[in-house]
Amino acid sequence: MDKKAREYAQDALKFIQRSGSNFLACKNLKERLENNGFINLSEGETWNLNKNEGYVLCKENRNICGFFVGKNFNIDTGSILISIGHIDSCALKISPNNNVIKKKIHQINVECYGSGLWHTWFDRSLGLSGQVLYKKGNKLVEKLIQINKSVLFLPSLAIHLQNRTRYDFSVKINYENHIKPIISTTLFNQLNKCKRNNVHHDTILTTDTKFSHKENSQNKRDDQMCHSFNDKDVSNHNLDKNTIEHLTNQQNEEKNKHTKDNPNSKDIVEHINTDNSYPLLYLLSKELNCKEEDILDFELCLMDTQEPCFTGVYEEFIEGARFDNLLGSFCVFEGFIELVNSIKNHTSNENTNHTNNITNDINDNIHNNLYISIGYDHEEIGSLSEVGARSYCTKNFIDRIISSVFKKEIHEKNLSVQEIYGNLVNRSFILNVDMAHCSHPNYPETVQDNHQLFFHEGIAIKYNTNKNYVTSPLHASLIKRTFELYYNKYKQQIKYQNFMVKNDTPCGSTVGSMVAANLSMPGIDIGIPQLAMHSIREIAAVHDVFFLIKGVFAFYTYYNQVLSTCVHDK
């Protein structure tokens, strides 16, 4: 198990490093499914689905759904087994109007997404990841990018400048005033522009000019007028008359050229967006190989460029960003892929096994079901969006699958999609995976003594009688039994531990209850322990990754078998 656990953890870290945002996580999970034989679908096309086949669907590059239709999927004995997670994480996202200039420094205005431990983002090497929209000829192009090198930083205030006693932690961070990452100085921004325009800039290097603008966010327009030249943020104070005249002529020629080539673009060309930081646009234009003025909008997350890694003297831990919940979602999809591969192997080998009287690794009724794995966006901010868990996208996906797979039954027996769904839902189940809180050795008072979570002790089964978690004793027992059946077959234990928050502590919530309510389907909330949740650098244990992946696999493989043995004692 040690070797396999490390392999799983290594794969998870590689995935997380490549997934600096929700967009890239969706893209990378989609590629992972396609590499395992899943067929790509689009919402805007007619679905002609086949049994014993896997499919993958992305909605707006924010929500990913993989599913596999069992070869004997049927109305009478089949079920819908769903494992879910969320692919967003707390992050600093660049604002639409992000141009900030203070003390001869270009900064970026950002917005706090979710409830992050924002003080941990200070003094880190920050890159960018996300979605950019730009013009290319007559087309509007969406591009997903990730810049893994350090292009931004958020400096702390030096200890000597803080009005504090030696026992204070630090200055209190104001999220509006203090979280504005630095991208460049105004000097180097001007030098770069002059270099690109083949203009001599010796005067800039020898001039020590005080800027006359008011460094106040309420006077940003005045700021831009003092700092920008022809709406391109070139300082008039630092350029001589010839340089100004040269730049004016060059920009007018460029504008006239664009207008002449495309008369319809006149209004667009004449409007140069000064609300966006020019150094940021320059960076993005290099990445996209386009012009700055062609960039229309973006959704970009700041990300830590330091790679995740194994840690601890025995390398029993892993550390990195976005474990909540990319680590959980990786385990969801990995367990799902392993299940599908085992079904395919079972199908291809069952005739040979029957002839040679070989016992199959999995039970035959595993072919009777529809298996689904989903990664939602926007969990960190409440899930209320078209790609979040509160939407009806999951129910829409299931309805479309039923309509395609049971097309013949619907026509010949005059059945409705809702009738078929109503028959299936009674045997169906949701397994929601989201990270959990490990007992912190430095803050032992934060957890209930009877419900502590420990590293290497396995999956956390989350309970909350106020339904912040969807778990009930009945359904927790069903899942625990699947773990036992997995052990009976493979002789590998899937450890688990029960979790509940203190009565005097607010209980976090996740998407399990939301999806269960939308689908009228029972479920359970699970996860694995981690420390420093919502920090830019989080900690988890290697062996728990193994337990979670195998737990998802066991759920898919044995849930129906366990459910069939469940009886009510009269």
From Swiss-Prot:
Looking up SUPFAM superfamilies in the UniProt record yields: Aminopeptidase/glucanase lid domain, Zn-dependent exopeptidases
Q: Where in the cell is it found?
A: Cytoplasm
Q: Which domain of life is it from?
A: Eukaryota
Q: How does activity depend on pH?
A: Optimum pH is 7.5.
| Entry-linked CDD domains | M18_DAP
Question: In which residues is Zn(2+) 2 bound?
Answer: 324, 380, 534
Q: Which GO terms describe its cellular component?
A: cytoplasm
Q: Which residues form a coiled coil?
A: none
What are the record keywords, sorted? Aminopeptidase, Cytoplasm, Hydrolase, Metal-binding, Metalloprotease, Protease, Zinc
Annotated catalysed reactions: Release of an N-terminal aspartate or glutamate from a peptide, with a preference for aspartate
Q: What name does this protein carry? A: Aspartyl aminopeptidase
Species per Swiss-Prot/TrEMBL record: Plasmodium falciparum (isolate 3D7)
From which lineage does this chain's organism come?
Eukaryota, Sar, Alveolata, Apicomplexa, Aconoidasida
